[in-house]
Each structure stands twice: as structure tokens, then as C-alpha cells.
């Protein structure tokens, strides 16, 4: 599995543009074969800082994503809305996906 986390700081005056673009992009990426998860969340303490979490089934799925028309659009468009170059963590991990967190157990309803 490919696991990617990207930190994106947007320019305050471009926030609405970023939200519109990332919403469109997320939907396109989620529809790709081999995408396990693709989400974008805003940091609760840093306004205009967003974190993208992307998981692909394998390297081939990740490569297909990067080559896609919408990814090429995103990479070209992103500089128009960010305040700094995004930072990224990229890891190839064993396994096929997410598993339950063993430290947490749900409370039963009474």
C-alpha cells in the first residue's frame, strides 16, 4: 500500500478557490481504480492549513494517479492558491489497507 500525507498552506484570500478545487479533485481521485482513501482536512489550530491523506493499493495505482489528467491539472493549479511549497510524506507499506486500532474498544450501549 502507498501511504501519502501532504501538508498544504493556502493563501487566505485564495481559500474559497482552494476549497472548490480540492473538492473537485478529491471526487476525481476517489473514483480512480486503486485508490483506497483520499481525504482533505483542515487543521483545527492553523487556519488555511490543510492535510491530504492519500492511500493507493500499490505503486501502479499511484503512478496511474500521477499520470491522470486531473492530477496534472491539480499540480499546475496548486501554486496559484498556496502560500508555500507543500510538504509530503511518502511511504510504501506492507499490507492491503487499514486495520482497526487495537488500543480503542467501543463502549457497549446500555
Q: Which residues make up each language-model segment?
A:
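Short, surface-exposed ligand-recognition loops at beta-strand->loop->(often short) alpha-helix junctions
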Residues: 9-18
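Short alpha-helical
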Residues: 13, 45-47, 57, 69, ...
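Short, flexible segments with low predicted structural confidence
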Residues: 1-2, 17, 33-35
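Glycine-rich beta-strand-turn "strand-cap" elements at beta-sheet edges
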Residues: 39-48, 75-110
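Short, well-ordered beta-strand segments in beta-rich or mixed alpha/beta enzyme
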Residues: 2-8, 39-66, 103
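An amphipathic, aromatic/His-enriched active-site/gating alpha helix that lines ligand/cofactor pockets
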Residues: 24, 28-36, 55-90
Amino acid at each position: 500500500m502507498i501511504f501519502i500525507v501532504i501538508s498544504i498552506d493556502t493563501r487566505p484570500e485564495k481559500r474559497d478557490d482552494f476549497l472548490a478545487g480540492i473538492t473537485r479533485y478529491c471526487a476525481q481521485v476517489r473514483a480512480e481504480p486503486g485508490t483506497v482513501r483520499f481525504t482533505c482536512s483542515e487543521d483545527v489550530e492553523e487556519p488555511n492549513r490543510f492535510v491530504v491523506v492519500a492511500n493507493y493499493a500499490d505503486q501502479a495505482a499511484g503512478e496511474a494517479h500521477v499520470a491522470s489528467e486531473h492530477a496534472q491539472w491539480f499540480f499546475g493549479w496548486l501554486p496559484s492558491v498556496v502560500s508555500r511549497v507543500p510538504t509530503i510524506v511518502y511511504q510504501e507499506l506492507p499490507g492491503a489497507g487499514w486495520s482497526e486500532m487495537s488500543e480503542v474498544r467501543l463502549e457497549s450501549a446500555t
